[in-house]
């Protein structure tokens, strides 16, 4: 899991990010914030963890999957116009773990079970099985569960503290709010039980032979899947494996 730690700094940083991301920058005073940036149509572009940068200049660290860092920099640069905002690679690396948190570590804002994160000169983790943790707690990951066609509410962002419905406008807010208040989600992330062996990406077939979704991250006999919930009411097949819905995300 390669991560890039960007720095966003300048006198307009907080207001600039507030108008773009799905969460409320005011929460940064209490600790790290999980958020995403969306297209105007409400679809996923990138998700990240924000924290206050060391020092007193009001800068913000943006912890993002390295595969999305160039896109995120490009998108932030496009929106900044005349704002006093500078965007750069901090050069910091991510360390993470589940045990006692070392000095300078911060809690993962998505779920307490994900432990701590610390930024410094070296990358690494404490050997915890983060795939199993992600699957157990239905935490989607870029390039696996999350992609350009994803809607964040289908991917569990409300449960993972990644969206605030009381803040002001941000890019993609109208679509996200409509999904929250006017529609029942018919598709989305789910935790499933797996009996047999199936590879990530396998299409799920319901009892009537219809496509019910797709398998994603697999850890032992548990997996994450993107499902059509109306077709996930009974056993499904993923190749030769049997799949059963356990919990909607």
Regions found by a protein language model. Name each.
Residues 130-186, 191:
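A mid-sequence, solvent-exposed acidic-amphipathic segment
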Residues 155-162, 177-249:
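Glycine-rich, small/acidic residue-mixed loop/short-helix segments
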Residues 35-47, 101-105, 176, 208-212:
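Short amphipathic beta-strand starts and helix->beta connectors
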Residues 2-7, 49-140, 238:
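Acidic, low-complexity central loop/insert segments
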Residues 19-26, 70, 74-82, 181, ...:
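Short, intrinsically disordered, mixed-charge
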Residues 1-20, 86-99, 184-194:
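Short glycine-/aliphatic-rich beta-strand segments at the starts of folded cytosolic domains
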Residues 10, 62, 172, 209:
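Residue-level signal for inorganic ion chemistry
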Residues 1-46, 54-55:
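Acidic, proline/glycine-enriched N-terminal capping motif
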């Amino acid at each position: 899991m390669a991560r890039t730690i960007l720095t966003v700094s300048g006198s307009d940083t907080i207001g600039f990010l507030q108008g773009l991301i799905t969460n409320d920058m005011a929460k940064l005073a209490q600790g790290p914030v999980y958020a995403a940036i969306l297209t105007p149509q409400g679809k996923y572009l990138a998700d990240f963890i924000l924290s206050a940068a060391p020092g007193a200049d009001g800068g913000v660290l943006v912890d993002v999957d390295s595969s999305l860092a160039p896109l995120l920099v490009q998108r932030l640069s496009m929106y900044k116009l005349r704002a006093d905002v500078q965007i750069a690679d901090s050069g910091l690396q991510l360390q993470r773990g589940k045990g006692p948190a070392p000095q300078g570590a911060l809690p993962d804002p998505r779920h307490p079970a994900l432990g701590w994160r610390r930024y410094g000169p070296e990358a690494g983790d404490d050997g915890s099985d983060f795939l199993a943790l992600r699957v157990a707690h239905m935490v989607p990951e870029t390039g696996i569960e999350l992609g350009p066609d994803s809607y964040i509410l289908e991917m569990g962002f409300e449960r993972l503290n990644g969206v605030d419905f009381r803040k002001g406008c941000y890019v993609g807010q109208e679509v996200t709010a409509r999904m929250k208040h006017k529609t029942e989600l018919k598709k989305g992330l789910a935790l499933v039980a797996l009996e047999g062996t199936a590879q990530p990406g396998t299409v799920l077939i319901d009892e009537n032979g219809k496509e019910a979704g797709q398998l994603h991250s697999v850890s032992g006999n548990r997996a994450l899947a993107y499902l059509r919930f109306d077709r996930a009411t009974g056993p499904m097949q993923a190749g030769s494996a049997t799949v059963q819905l356990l919990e909607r995300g």
